[in-house]
């Protein structure tokens, strides 16, 4: 959106992981990609001297006290978009004394996902006039797949049209054991059921592969789908595919939520494909979205293998209920969209670019 509004704008994107760097290199609207500097003066000074930004934008929870202070001293406005401050994080920031209070107060403006984040920012001493709730741009990030694209993806994964599939996305250590326990029970009732298992971090693929072997599951990986027909588990060992892979399933589970401290990963991607979504009890980072979706009957909490198996089974055997959830989920996603447009407009205004007609 921003590139369309201001084609002459130079956009430099910082990342913190190798996988993020690899993904960013494929974004045609980004002019340069670099690893975010360590948050101490020699490194931040060097980065700013090379880039010489007119505006710094950070998303979600990227609060770098040293960098924000340096930007403030150089009169470079810093904006927070998709701002999120959980209750646990707010307590930590308050315990840190003046460090994070001063950091938040040095932002030019904070654009928060929801009123919970707004309240936390106020508690940290940010002036109310410097805070605005604009929503979460993640609702705008996914482009809907056509039926033809979904069919091509299904064929790529060598799935039959009537094969039941459930997807466990963004899983963390300790969760795969629970998920596989539930899957083993589910296969008794649904012999053809396929689990697509997607660990959050690619460096854990070998660890999860070893677990699958130890538990004697027939499995294949996304990178070698030659034997998918006989597998009950497909291990997603590629980057950047999970969002679209949700389109293959009937039910989804979202990780980093079954084991303390958890926090939860995004519910938005599976909901955008109309899937009923399950999560564990530890969802502080996504609580606001989860509560709204819970109230609309779109997501469900489970705490152990038995509850996970029971809920997946109930949803699999009730296609009419899944269809009802799917229709409601699409309406829910549409109602939450619009934050990305607002953010692009804000950046354009801050840089004094004329807004296109």
Question: What is the predicted function of each stretch?
Answer:
Residues 1-357:
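Nucleotide-activated sugar donor-binding and catalytic core shared by glycosyltransferases
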């Amino acid at each position: 959106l921003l590139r369309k509004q201001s084609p002459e704008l130079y956009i430099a994107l910082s990342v913190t992981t190798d996988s993020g760097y690899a993904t960013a290199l494929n974004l045609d609207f980004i002019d340069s990609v670099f690893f975010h500097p360590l948050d101490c003066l020699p490194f931040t000074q060097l980065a700013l001297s090379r880039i010489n930004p007119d505006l710094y934008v950070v998303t979600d929870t990227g609060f770098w006290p040293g960098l924000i202070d340096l930007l403030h001293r150089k009169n470079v406005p810093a904006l927070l978009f998709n701002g999120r401050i959980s209750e646990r994080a707010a307590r930590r920031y308050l315990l840190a004394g003046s460090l994070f209070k001063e950091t938040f107060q040095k932002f030019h403006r904070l654009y928060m996902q929801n009123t919970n984040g707004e309240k936390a920012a106020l508690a940290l001493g940010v002036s109310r006039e410097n805070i605005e709730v604009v929503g979460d741009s993640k609702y705008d990030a996914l482009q809907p797949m056509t039926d033809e694209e979904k069919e091509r993806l299904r064929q790529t994964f060598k799935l039959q049209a009537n094969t039941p599939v459930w997807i466990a996305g963004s899983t963390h250590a300790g969760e795969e054991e629970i998920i596989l326990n539930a899957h083993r029970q589910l296969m008794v009732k649904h012999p053809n059921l396929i689990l697509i298992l997607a660990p959050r971090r690619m460096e854990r693929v070998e660890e999860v592969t070893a677990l699958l072997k130890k538990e004697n599951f027939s499995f294949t990986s996304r990178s070698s789908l030659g034997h998918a027909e006989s597998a009950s588990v497909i291990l997603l060992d590629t980057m950047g595919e999970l969002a679209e892979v949700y389109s293959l399933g009937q039910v989804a589970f979202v990780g980093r939520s079954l084991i303390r401290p958890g926090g939860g990963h995004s519910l938005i991607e599976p909901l955008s494909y109309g899937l009923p979504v399950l999560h564990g009890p530890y969802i502080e980072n996504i609580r606001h979205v989860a509560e709204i979706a819970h109230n609309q009957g779109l997501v469900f909490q489970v705490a152990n293998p038995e509850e996970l198996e029971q809920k997946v089974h109930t949803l699999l055997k009730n296609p009419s209920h899944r269809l009802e959830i799917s229709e409601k989920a699409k309406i829910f996603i549409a109602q939450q969209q619009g934050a990305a447009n607002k953010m692009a407009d804000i950046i354009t205004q801050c840089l004094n670019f004329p807004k296109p007609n």
